[in-house]
Amino acid sequence: MMLRQIVSILLLCCCPPLVAQEQEWQVDSLPADSSVIKPDSQQVYEVLLRMLDRWNAHDIDGYLEVYLKSPELLVVVDSEQFNGWQQLHDSYINGYPDRVAMGFIQPKRIQVKLLKPDLALALTWWSVSFPSSKQEMMGNSTMNLQKFDDGWKIVASHTSVGGM
């Protein structure tokens, strides 16, 4: 009887880490073990890096290439909601007549998790600095990306912006 209790306790102690391992992010820009990166997760990570690169180049059209060009796209930035790619595009074009005002984004951390073979969840933490001031804006974004014939595209996202 005592042996059975010891075995039960050992099993309970060993099982939670196995469950936790399956729920880990496949890509984390601060990885504990980079050898576990999966190809699709890496593709999503690279899409996000390309998006940030285009922002820093002040290339709005290039930045928006990673979003699904569809009226079904949903983007929420704080309390402002954009329905469809065209509305998002127009908002960026009109909101940044001086592209330098976009500032420069620096990713702090990017995590990617495949939910299905063609669906991924990404979390990013970032800061934006502005050349005209010494202020820095910080925030985070949650994005759902779907795999299409032409690659991974953001189909929904939510961004929260912190103080400056």
Where are the regions a protein language model picked out?
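Sec-dependent N-terminal signal peptides
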Residues: 5-14
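Hydrophobic pocket/interface hotspot
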Residues: 51, 63-64, 72-73, 88, ...
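Short, low-complexity N-terminal intrinsically disordered segments enriched in polar/charged residues
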Residues: 21-66
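Surface-exposed, charged secondary-structure patches
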Residues: 87-131
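A short gly/proline-enriched turn/hairpin at secondary-structure junctions
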Residues: 72-83, 97-100
